[in-house]
């Protein structure tokens, strides 16, 4: 008979990475922050939804700030000190996520805006009438 797998939780090893890239995706509905090493391997991540915000509260700047602080704290545990920031998307959490990463104590070397802009591509969705 096969041996049962142990139920003891596996301890996450501490990586020693000094610099990395913070990818901030700020959509209209949520803000996601992923911090990776230079090769693109994810070190930590967080989103407004994973921090307990639901519905329209996920798209607020405060929710983006909380998500960025959480992802940044996890990355600091792995020894990360310098960051390049890549921001994409039109959401409200762009600036506040960037500011939150600065206040944690990261030294920011570059900020890039990677928001995709169509050169007259697909037809956009209809305008909202509220």
UniProtKB/Swiss-Prot annotation:
InterPro entries: Ribosomal_uS11, Ribosomal_uS11_bac-type, Ribosomal_uS11_CS, Ribosomal_uS11_sf. One of its GO terms (cellular component) is ribosome. SUPFAM superfamilies: Translational machinery components. Keywords: Ribonucleoprotein, Ribosomal protein, RNA-binding, rRNA-binding. Pfam families: Ribosomal_S11. It comes from the Bacteria. GO terms for biological process: translation. One of its GO terms (molecular function) is rRNA binding. Part of the 30S ribosomal subunit. Interacts with proteins S7 and S18. Binds to IF-3. Belongs to the universal ribosomal protein uS11 family. Located on the platform of the 30S subunit, it bridges several disparate RNA helices of the 16S rRNA. Forms part of the Shine-Dalgarno cleft in the 70S ribosome. NCBIfam families: PRK05309.1, uS11_bact. This is Small ribosomal subunit protein uS11. It comes from Acidiphilium cryptum (strain JF-5).
